[in-house]
């Protein structure tokens, strides 16, 4: 694999020499940073099992190497890397896998280690969604996830990835993560704080990542991280699990932040060692039981992961002074909810008791039941999935609901050919050789739902959302 030139400030190199253990050597670190990052993917087990995914992609000649800490994660090598971007493959478009850096799969693995099965989880810095979607898959779309993102421009990307992966148990918020400790104290069974950081571990992906690096900047970032972890710890219920992670390498933003929390609440913070998370953790394990992953250790991005438990209640923070505003939704009455469920089932959409229908004007939504305790405490950017819009003739089912709820085994499902599926993703109507019988057609490809179409004569009218329509080279170009 070709080398690339990484910019290293002298002060950074001095800091790394002091932070790095005696083995592996500092020269190994520098050499690893000059190598481009290996590509990696995570199979979305909400859509397909790992075994079925491997069978489906076997004809492509992809070399998939298992990632030790994530059984659904793989490093991927392709002979035709330049021929077709991974994001333009049919399997990616239908949400069967997520392009995710291997080391960024570590925090969620730690969150669910030792049989931990949380029902209400918060991801405090969630965009673009790799860890939120990984959490949802581990929860099998059950329970509730609050996914927060401070950057307004990234909330849209976060929602797009959640929708593509068929996730229904997520509520999105757009807040500074420092508000949650006061706003929702002791509300979450588990919290992931993948904290904003100096990004020292990502130089293999971005050789210029350290162009604006300085020790002073690290100190400012660490101060923010301490405020964030304090807020997260307040929002964690007694006995709950908090995972703190970064993609940086210095101790000030990593070990020191966790040690500060323990010094602040000495009787309430218990470090949970990660030595048994996967074979080979001893290469990255700190004396506190954290994982401090330098790039050369597992040939991935640099990363830090710590896991801790809240063992004692701590003093509450002052109640926030902001106003949430009126909640614009109302729960659907039981009788009408039954009618909606029956109508949805007729086009192949089904859901379990974890989701409950709510209404806003002519819009119908499905919210995870576990989020109801948070209504009135935070303002949501988006909640659950939009199921339908009502009109005089019935319901106009929404694309995100089809992706999350549809069963490809429904009697109105219609499997497209590769050429027809590509036309669908390009936003064009499809003219199948043998038209389906039903008027409302659940369009599938590779036995996966990709949309809902109206049959008009011999034509399937495309309903693929305009913002998702693709141009350029797609999967049949690589056939």
UniProtKB/Swiss-Prot annotation:
This is Ribosomal RNA small subunit methyltransferase F. Belongs to the class I-like SAM-binding methyltransferase superfamily. RsmB/NOP family. SUPFAM superfamilies: S-adenosyl-L-methionine-dependent methyltransferases (SSF53335). It holds the Pfam family Methyltr_RsmF_N. Its EC number is 2.1.1.178. Its main location: cytoplasm. GO terms for biological process: rRNA base methylation. It catalyses: cytidine(1407) in 16S rRNA + S-adenosyl-L-methionine = 5-methylcytidine(1407) in 16S rRNA + S-adenosyl-L-homocysteine + H(+). InterPro entries: Methyltr_RsmF_N, MeTrfase_RsmB-F_NOP2_cat, MeTrfase_RsmB-F_NOP2_dom, Nol1_Nop2_Fmu_2, Nop2p, RCMT, rRNA_ssu_MeTfrase_F, RsmB/NOL1/NOP2-like_CS. Specifically methylates the cytosine at position 1407 (m5C1407) of 16S rRNA. GO terms for molecular function: RNA binding; rRNA (cytosine-C5-)-methyltransferase activity. Keywords: Cytoplasm, Methyltransferase, RNA-binding, rRNA processing, S-adenosyl-L-methionine, Transferase. The active site is at 247 (nucleophile). It comes from the Bacteria. HAMAP family: 16SrRNA_methyltr_F (MF_01579). One of its GO terms (cellular component) is cytoplasm. S-adenosyl-L-methionine binds at residues 125-131, 149, 176, 194. It is found in: Cytoplasm. The gene is rsmF.
